[in-house]
Amino acid sequence: MTDTNLDILSLTDPAIAGILQKELQRQRDHLELIASENFTSAAVMAAQGSVLTNKYAEGLPKKRYYGGCEYIDEAEQLAIDRVKRLFGANHANVQPHSGAQANFAVFLTLLQPGDTIMGMDLSHGGHLTHGSPVNVSGKWFRVVQYGVSPESERLDYDLILDIARKEKPKLIICGYSAYSRQIDFEKFRAIADEVGAYLMADIAHIAGLVATGHHPNPLPHCDVVTTTTHKTLRGPRGGLIMTKDEELGKKFDKSVFPGTQGGPLEHVVAAKAVAFGEALKPEFKIYSGQVIANAQALAGQLKARGIKIVTDGTDNHLMLLDLRSVGMTGKEADRLVSTINITANKNTVPFDPESPFVTSGLRLGSPAMTTRGLGETEFIEIGNIIADILLNPGDEALRTACRQRVAKLCESFPLYPHLHISVPALA
């Protein structure tokens, strides 16, 4: 997205231009703490808003069903080569439109309807696509679930092994949407081998940390790895499938196209290539390390202020606040922090007595605001702001002061200062 493109948009469709302007301002004025969100670079947005959006390209590089794909092939092959280098994969498919699409392509390859899959309970930090009854994964397959220990709130690998021995799943899924500790992929491999299961890692949340060595890499231990390309990887919204097994990789390719998708979104694939190129640079490794340092600073300060952190801390980019410690629900906290321009999301905590629509938790993450340049000092201040508002929900004067502190942080670390959207006045 460039100023030129925005100028054209403001002239041809001022209504949409106006909406974009409002959203840009919202992003600039808020502390974005949703763990699954990030701010892409201007280069990623430029690729995604490019002429590649005009081209159909069913198939793979050098194996297309349409003519005129020679430059599309170059862009997609560059994305493939870069991501294989980034993660150490032997095979990669960069075409899935989303992480959910990537997961379903894997299921289509490895499973038949009625087969048993084993993933983490959604309420413990799993994901909808890992067997939730409201998702196709929970409708087409027999699902068994594992969770965390009631005492430590961490993965209990002995219990996971016991469940696997009893249920004999065909596929075991590890990788989560709300788990703040490192995953031992080697232990999962041993469990899968004992029961004869495939092992899949969904690293959508931690991909950027894996790419830079700040989290163990699942590829040496898993049959297949899926991920989104946004979140900690800081690319466009999309999905990705990787494996060390090239023959299995060819089967995944067929499950993406023609199995679950038609034409790929090659403008998004090009944006993925840009993001993978950025992630290969030394600066991105520094960024990933700062993401973790900032998350730990935030969790530490909230804990110091008396707010319970699930698992008592974090090893990655996110944390879960158990708000029973302050007599509040996740829904209430979500609404409360939004009044001071902090964006977060309510989330279940392990063994949560509340419904998923209310919850006892609030999920926070550091990737987006780390991208804006905030460091540990600023995240400690964010921790104090959040603690102040959660511990004093009825103090209007304090709420006003907290909103001003948020505004000061946002002004000190501007977002996309080069972007300007001028919207003509409507008659």
Swiss-Prot record:
Annotated keywords: Amino-acid biosynthesis, Cytoplasm, One-carbon metabolism, Pyridoxal phosphate, Transferase
Cofactor: pyridoxal 5'-phosphate
Source superkingdom: Bacteria
Family the entry assigns: Belongs to the SHMT family.
Catalysed reaction equations from the record: (6R)-5,10-methylene-5,6,7,8-tetrahydrofolate + glycine + H2O = (6S)-5,6,7,8-tetrahydrofolate + L-serine
BP GO annotations: glycine biosynthetic process from serine; tetrahydrofolate interconversion
Keyword Transferase attached: yes
Gene source species: Microcystis aeruginosa (strain NIES-843 / IAM M-2473)
InterPro entries xref list: PyrdxlP-dep_Trfase (IPR015424), PyrdxlP-dep_Trfase_major (IPR015421), PyrdxlP-dep_Trfase_small (IPR015422), Ser_HO-MeTrfase (IPR001085), Ser_HO-MeTrfase-like (IPR049943), Ser_HO-MeTrfase_PLP_BS (IPR019798), SHMT-like_dom (IPR039429)
Pfam families in UniProt: SHMT
Residues annotated with N6-(pyridoxal phosphate)lysine modification: K231
Subunit structure: Homodimer.
Marked site: Plays an important role in substrate specificity: H230
Subcellular location: Cytoplasm
Protein name as catalogued: Serine hydroxymethyltransferase
Predominant cellular place of this UniProt entry's protein: cytoplasm
Pathway assigned in UniProt: One-carbon metabolism; tetrahydrofolate interconversion; Amino-acid biosynthesis; glycine biosynthesis; glycine from L-serine: step 1/1
Binding positions ((6S)-5,6,7,8-tetrahydrofolate): L122, G126, H127, L128, E247, S355, P356, F357
Biological function: Catalyzes the reversible interconversion of serine and glycine with tetrahydrofolate (THF) serving as the one-carbon carrier. This reaction serves as the major source of one-carbon groups required for the biosynthesis of purines, thymidylate, methionine, and other important biomolecules. Also exhibits THF-independent aldolase activity toward beta-hydroxyamino acids, producing glycine and aldehydes, via a retro-aldol mechanism.
GO cellular component terms, A-Z: cytosol
E.C. number: 2.1.2.1
PANTHER family noted in UniProt: SERINE HYDROXYMETHYLTRANSFERASE, SERINE HYDROXYMETHYLTRANSFERASE 1
GO molecular function: glycine hydroxymethyltransferase activity; pyridoxal phosphate binding
